Amino acid sequence: MCDEDVAALVVDNGSGMCKAGFAGDDAPRAVFPSIVGRPRHQGVMVGMGQKDSYVGDEAQSKRGILTLKYPIEHGIVTNWDDMEKIWHHTFYNELRVAPEEHPVLLTEAPLNPKANREKMTQIMFETFNTPAMYVAIQAVLSLYASGRTTGIVMDSGDGVTHTVPIYEGYALPHAIMRLDLAGRDLTDYLMKILTERGYSFTTTAEREIVRDIKEKLCYVALDFEQEMQTASTSSSLEKSYELPDGQVITIGNERFRCPEATFQPSFLGMEAAGIHETTYNSIMKCDVDIRKDLYANTVLSGGSTMFPGIADRMQKEITALAPPTMKIKIIAPPERKYSVWIGGSILASLSTFQQMWISKQEYDESGPSIVHRKCF
């Protein structure tokens, strides 16, 4: 890129939300749900200008007449036609830019299949005619955003949770762990345990309400059994929440029972290990000489790590698993909900990064497989 004054675009496509904006900014300009909706019925009114598909917030607000689909499942793109619609919406409606004028930095899940990165590359160059692009691993960007190049990132979003050890800027694929338990599952679980209290939440509209309850009132207990004890003997942990129709509901031990599932997936009927064990197992898969650096640089990232109390609990749990004298530090940056995007913004604006872009010319010469040679 000889043209230094053109800002690169940074697009972080998550299972739940898409974050997009310009490199060099400190926060994404656009954050919208990663959903594509199609009308359930043929329009009755002629000339209503009904579109064949809606994306993001517009799809969310018209969900009564649409069938909603999430093109990204568990962090990995499964529907390319819909994904293309999301990117189109990102460039033209949210950021209002011409993608053929800006380099684009995209993010991918750890252990993303090779064919997927090639497909992303192909769509960017052939459909959107970008002058240059790059694909970066989400967890690596979160680590950059925290000002580190070595550490282990526990990234938990809406669709998937990963623990990714990174040494000197490179992810160590053999030690990456994936846990299919994240924000969406926690919302489902909260819906379930609120139903036990006698409140009924079933529809997609109600699911959004429960997600809001989760984000506003849930927290992680330092000692779960102790907290359950406290909740059963006093009402000090109870909070009330006003529903959109004005009805007020009370929520007690559900506040910490919901996020506890990330430490005890058995609550959801899953046999997987909790996030603390997963992080520990990831570290143990790494070379013995770098473990010390990973324990001392454990970085939390993603929306599902936003629960109050999560860092203290991680500290406690990992200390119990690790060797007795090991220094353990859990880093939970306040902006961790967007740290993947922020890391991308930092990376794409570094002068040393400018020769890393895959240019249109390189793509034309080598085809989509160029992505494996230039992005790792």
From Swiss-Prot:
The modification N-acetylcysteine is found at residue 2. Signal peptide: none annotated. It is found in: Cytoplasm, Cytoskeleton. Its main location: cytoplasm. SUPFAM superfamilies: Actin-like ATPase domain. Its EC number is 3.6.4.-. The modification Methionine (R)-sulfoxide is found at residues 45, 48. The modification Tele-methylhistidine is found at residue 74. The keyword Secreted does not apply. One of its GO terms (molecular function) is ATP binding. Actins are highly conserved proteins that are involved in various types of cell motility and are ubiquitously expressed in all eukaryotic cells. Belongs to the actin family. This is Actin, cytoplasmic. It comes from Biomphalaria glabrata (Bloodfluke planorb).
